[in-house]
Amino acid sequence: MTSTGPETSETPGATTQRHGFGIDVGGSGIKGGIVDLDTGQLIGDRIKLLTPQPATPLAVAKTIAEVVNGFGWRGPLGVTYPGVVTHGVVRTAANVDKSWIGTNARDTIGAELGGQQVTILNDADAAGLAETRYGAGKNNPGLVVLLTFGTGIGSAVIHNGTLIPNTEFGHLEVGGKEAEERAASSVKEKNDWTYPKWAKQVIRVLIAIENAIWPDLFIAGGGISRKADKWVPLLENRTPVVPAALQNTAGIVGAAMASVADTTH
């Protein structure tokens, strides 16, 4: 059965459901699924394929098309990208091929899908949208900052539900180093730091962000957030910090959200 989405389905006695489709592009895998936009839950299973190597724009676009076609989805879709994207054009490339820089990803992916409408946005921005609507930031108005701790540090800023895209706080200079050189979880692993020692570096990054924009809430994401009990209580900055709630689905959900209400820049 082909899904045309974004769609609204009504059943007597049931609430109205809105469906969207999201793709999350990572350095090792490309995953996608249909999302219930009323609840933020995936409908059925997701499909995950290996990211092609080299991860050129055309190779990635073909893999995305394979995922989308696996669901028979024919409507608009959202796609995350691990870097800066403005007006559909890629500006940076870290975990993918450098040939992405300057590529109109929106058009390249759309062409592989026969002209389907594509919204593309930074992967951390997508996760931030999802977490503030359905996850750890739900019912928290004001200025919310998501930080994803991994190989680097990704960031998203959402103000009263509106995304401020491409913040790139991982490249903020903190004490003579970029924030991600100081406090990415990969730095902890490389140096074999204890959680208390690493937390001191995270505090420095959080304070630098606080001094710039005074957020109301930090959401800590990335794989290390699954062990938040070991380090979040050690953070002595002024703004509350909570672990991300959606984990592996946040990118797909946020991308699907963006496809329905284009929040990109």
From Swiss-Prot:
<keyword id="KW-0418">Kinase</keyword>
<feature type="binding site">
    <location>
        <begin position="24"/>
        <end position="29"/>
    </location>
    <ligand>
        <name>ATP</name>
    </ligand>
</feature>
<keyword id="KW-0808">Transferase</keyword>
<dbReference type="GO" id="GO:0004340">
    <property type="term" value="F:glucokinase activity"/>
</dbReference>
<comment type="similarity">
    <text>Belongs to the ROK (NagC/XylR) family.</text>
</comment>
<feature type="region of interest" description="Disordered">
    <location>
        <begin position="1"/>
        <end position="22"/>
    </location>
</feature>
<dbReference type="Pfam" id="PF00480">
    <property type="entry name" value="ROK"/>
</dbReference>
<dbReference type="GO" id="GO:0047330">
    <property type="term" value="F:polyphosphate-glucose phosphotransferase activity"/>
</dbReference>
<keyword id="KW-0547">Nucleotide-binding</keyword>
<dbReference type="InterPro" id="IPR000600">
    <property type="entry name" value="ROK"/>
</dbReference>
<feature type="compositionally biased region" description="Polar residues">
    <location>
        <begin position="1"/>
        <end position="18"/>
    </location>
</feature>
<comment type="function">
    <text>Catalyzes the phosphorylation of glucose using polyphosphate or ATP as the phosphoryl donor. Polyphosphate, rather than ATP, seems to be the major phosphate donor for the enzyme in M.tuberculosis. GTP, UTP and CTP can replace ATP as phosphoryl donor.</text>
</comment>
<protein>
    <recommendedName>
        <fullName>Polyphosphate glucokinase</fullName>
        <ecNumber>2.7.1.63</ecNumber>
        <ecNumber>2.7.1.2</ecNumber>
    </recommendedName>
</protein>
<dbReference type="GO" id="GO:0005524">
    <property type="term" value="F:ATP binding"/>
</dbReference>
<keyword id="KW-0067">ATP-binding</keyword>
<comment type="subunit">
    <text>Homodimer.</text>
</comment>
<dbReference type="InterPro" id="IPR043129">
    <property type="entry name" value="ATPase_NBD"/>
</dbReference>
